[in-house]
């Protein structure tokens, strides 16, 4: 994963803007052509560069950027009932610090999204999540018979 504002990228932006300013002028000198060639070389070298390694704070910052509010794991989450005899687990440091990794690799370490509750489900939850004592009282009151303002338990 490349850095967002790398030196070759900044150099290309600067060179490209300067070149556009110079194009309006009909006179082109060899220094202008050399400057343009240098810019193109910087652009192609940054475009063909492989993914970089991320370690320490840079790795944590990249994970926070990619995962956002979900959070992230340093080891890949495993399923339930995984065997203790399994092979040693590799983590994000092994994959992105000791070797280079890309954006997809970083996303594999993001925590899953937590489902959000809608307003309707919250209202339904209020009714169904009454404390047990209140439910019992409510059930007792509804099970009473009514015979002329006298309440009898059935």
Curated annotation (Swiss-Prot):
Biased composition (Basic and acidic residues): 126-139
Signal found in the keyword field: yes
Main location: secreted
Gene3D superfamilies assigned to the protein according to its UniProt record, in alphabetical order: Insulin-like
Propeptide residues according to the Swiss-Prot or TrEMBL record: 120-154
Gene Ontology annotations of biological process type: cell population proliferation; insulin-like growth factor receptor signaling pathway; negative regulation of apoptotic process; negative regulation of release of cytochrome c from mitochondria; negative regulation of smooth muscle cell apoptotic process; positive regulation of cell population proliferation; positive regulation of D-glucose import; positive regulation of glycogen biosynthetic process
Biased composition (Polar residues): 140-154
S-S pairs: 55-97, 67-110, 96-101
Region of interest called D, as start-end residue ranges on this chain: 112-119
Renumbered residue ranges of the record's region Disordered: 120-154
Region (A): 91-111
Tissue/organ expression: Expressed in all tissues examined: brain, lung, liver, spleen, uterus, ovary, testis, heart and skeletal muscle.
Compartments in which it is found: Secreted
Top-level lineage group: Eukaryota
Pfam families (alphabetical): Insulin
Stretches the record annotates as B: 50-78
InterPro entries found in the cross-reference section: IGF-I, Insulin-like, Insulin-like_growth_factor, Insulin-like_sf, Insulin_CS, Insulin_family
SMART domains given in the database record: IlGF (SM00078)
Any single Gene Ontology cellular-component annotation: extracellular space
Region of interest (C), ranges: 79-90
Function: The insulin-like growth factors, isolated from plasma, are structurally and functionally related to insulin but have a much higher growth-promoting activity. May be a physiological regulator of [1-14C]-2-deoxy-D-glucose (2DG) transport and glycogen synthesis in osteoblasts. Stimulates glucose transport in bone-derived osteoblastic (PyMS) cells and is effective at much lower concentrations than insulin, not only regarding glycogen and DNA synthesis but also with regard to enhancing glucose uptake. May play a role in synapse maturation.
Entry similarity comment: Belongs to the insulin family.
Subunit structure: Forms a ternary complex with IGFR1 and ITGAV:ITGB3. Forms a ternary complex with IGFR1 and ITGA6:ITGB4. Forms a ternary complex with IGFBP3 and ALS.
Protein's UniProt name: Insulin-like growth factor 1
The species this protein was found in: Capra hircus (Goat)
């Amino acid at each position: 994963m490349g850095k967002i504002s790398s030196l070759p990228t900044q150099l290309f932006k600067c060179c490209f803007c300067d070149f556009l300013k110079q194009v309006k002028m009909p006179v082109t000198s060899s220094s202008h052509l050399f400057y343009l060639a240098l810019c193109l070389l910087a652009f192609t070298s940054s475009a063909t560069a492989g993914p970089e390694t991320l370690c320490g704070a840079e790795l944590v910052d990249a994970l926070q950027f990619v995962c956002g509010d979900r959070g992230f794991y340093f080891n890949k989450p495993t399923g339930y009932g995984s065997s203790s005899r399994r092979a040693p687990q590799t983590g994000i440091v092994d994959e992105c610090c000791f070797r280079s990794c890309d954006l997809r690799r970083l996303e594999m370490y993001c925590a899953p999204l937590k489902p959000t509750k809608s307003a309707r489900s919250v209202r339904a939850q209020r009714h169904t999540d009454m404390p047990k004592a209140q439910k019992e009282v409510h059930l007792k009151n509804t099970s009473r018979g009514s015979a002329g303002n006298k309440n009898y338990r059935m």
